[in-house]
Amino acid sequence: MDWQKRTTQMLGRFQPWHERHTELFRSAFHDYGQVIIMLIESDGTAKNPLSVDQRASFIVETLVREGYVYKTDFEIMPVPNIVALSSGKTTYKMTHKSIEDEE
């Protein structure tokens, strides 16, 4: 990834990654040109059975199959159980594209 280039993030559990997530990725990539996918640590429960590594592998396989280049078009970063986003600057654009009605 070009660390100077405009980037957007996708934050979630992605348990599992599915077509609506891929659609969200396509939209984010179209709008910003590169995406950091932040995988919330949520391993080992009945609701969240997949490990970060399993989810990351599946996401990479899916997006590469779609024609995106890992480490150039997108990267994956494990993160703790983030429950809120805070920003002290108005220079950051906060957008919300919901896919909850499909889950």
Report residues per predicted region.
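Nucleotidyltransferase catalytic core that binds NTPs
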Residues: 1-103
